[in-house]
Amino acid sequence: MLRWLKTIFAKIVYLMTEKDFFSPPYPVSKNEGKSIWKAPSNIALIKYWGKKENQIPANPSLSFTLSSCATTTIMEYRRLEKRGTNFDFDLFFEGKPMESFRPKIETFLKRIEVYLPFLKEYHFKIETSNSFPHSSGIASSASGMAALALCLMDLEKELNPEMEPDFFKKKASFLARLGSGSACRSIEGDLILWGADQDFPESTDLYAIKYPFEVHEVFKNYQDTILLVHKGQKQVSSTVG
């Protein structure tokens, strides 16, 4: 019976494609502004292990967001007098310039430029901080890329005020995925599914969704205890896995 209902539901579910995330001409211009977002890290109950081309997961994953582990990003933006040929941004982590993060942000911006065509029209000052050590296995890249994607979507929402809230979240997840796969699961909580699965008609490889079915009460008070034994970087990433 449940599978039959899922089959019927699948017929009315519209799954967004990459083309849906291309931006129309913007009706509004914005010279400068500021956006602040706090995004949670997440811990996978079912982990993806390895990715295909274009940040597509090798298998679906299911995760909980972590209420006490988060990244806060403040993004200030100012329109340039002339559109640049390169991305123009300054990056600070915990109040200090962080040049070692620049290549990853550059790669992220290159991947998403086709979906956010305004990126080379602005100078960005990006300030980010974590409530936990980065690169130690607590998915700081997930919360960091999610927070940055949300800030960039804030700017696009300013340029396109008619944007629907549901589309805002889906595109933020879509963009975050292109920065770090698990980042697409950090846009909202609490139980999140990423990756196409035949038993979940709304699921897709392009962005994460809330787990769409009833969750047992025992999982609504689920706890994750983090014990730090070393603050160094983990040796094996999910991408390599």
Say what each PLM segment does.
Residues 126, 134-186, 190-193:
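Long, hydrophobic, well-ordered secondary-structure blocks that form the structural core
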Residues 164, 168-241:
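ATP-dependent small-molecule kinase catalytic core of the GHMP/sugar-kinase superfamily
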Residues 5-136, 150-161, 165:
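ATP-binding N-lobe of GHMP and related small-molecule kinases
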